[in-house]
Design a protein with these regions (language model features):
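Glycan-recognition and catalytic cores of secretory/periplasmic carbohydrate-active enzymes
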Residues: 236
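Ferredoxin-type iron-sulfur electron-transfer modules and their immediate structural context
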Residues: 1-223, 227-230, 250-252, 256-260
Length: 261
């Protein structure tokens, strides 16, 4: 009898709590829109936040209310975007693919101005006089981009520069946001040539702090037959809309800061 009473008491409490929870769910529960649930089932579930929403659930709700378009998800395959567009009853436009591209050619070849002993992150290093590199624009090499990429698309090379795997990169733009030096840019992969530098220092300074940097010699600008390259503010820029991948710029570049993808 002494065992039966506690057992019955616990059973009664369990029943009471169960009924209470069921009632609370009925009164306070939030019904999920079937369309949102269907859209969510199509999304990859990466919850990377690159779309600007609070994970895939937030993105699904934004899609249903037509705040965003399916193309805003960088992780989705094109067929997934088509399926979501059909659910929403809208026309889908194929998204042009981009790849995160590092615009720094320094790394281990760039001169250090002091021995950094602090926390091994680029963000922390930047707080100390802009980082240990003599080039104020250069990559610090601690891999904030590597840690920030949710798809494992970035690794550190032996030259202390990040390497982007084009097969894994979704162009989500997280590396663009986490790099304190703003050294990543999303570029179209069909444009094979780009200037791997962001320094706007004059050539004499660049030569002292980072020999493989852009010295604004204008040889590329003069050699380009389509006028796709302009040197502005001591830095060469390739305008993708005009570039026809001829490679003349790479041939004449004395520091080899223009590279082929």
């Amino acid at each position: 009898m002494t065992v039966l009473i506690p057992a019955l008491t616990m059973a009664a409490l369990g029943l009471a709590f169960g009924v209470g929870l069921a009632y609370a769910l009925k009164i306070f529960g939030i019904e999920v829109d079937p369309a949102v649930a269907l859209i969510l089932s199509k999304l990859p579930g990466a919850n990377c936040g690159a779309c600007g929403k609070a994970g895939c659930a937030g993105f699904a709700e934004a899609l249903k209310s037509h705040e965003v378009m399916p193309a805003a998800c960088a992780v989705c395959e094109d067929e997934t975007r088509v399926a979501i567009a059909e659910i929403l009853g809208i026309e889908h436009k194929t998204k042009v693919k981009f790849i995160a591209t590092l615009l720094c050619n320094g790394g281990s070849r760039a001169v250090d101005k002091f021995a950094y002993k602090g926390i091994k992150t680029c963000k922390a290093a930047t707080l100390q006089f802009g980082g240990q590199k003599a080039c104020e624009f250069g990559c610090l090499g601690f891999g904030d981009c590597v840690m920030g990429c949710p798809f494992g698309a970035i690794s550190m090379g032996e030259d202390l520069l990040p390497i982007v795997d084009p097969n894994k990169c979704t162009a989500c733009g997280i590396c663009v946001d986490v790099c304190p030096k703003a050294l990543f840019s999303l570029l179209p992969p069909d444009k094979k040539y780009y200037v791997k530098c962001k320094s706007t220092d004059i050539g004499a300074i660049v030569t002292k702090v980072c020999r493989p940097g852009c010295i604004a010699c204008r040889k590329c600008e003069k050699a380009c037959p389509t006028g796709a390259i302009k040197v502005e503010n001591n830095l060469a820029w390739i305008y993708c809309a005009k570039c026809e991948n001829m490679g003349k710029c790479l041939e004449v570049c004395p520091t080899k800061v223009i590279v082929r993808r």
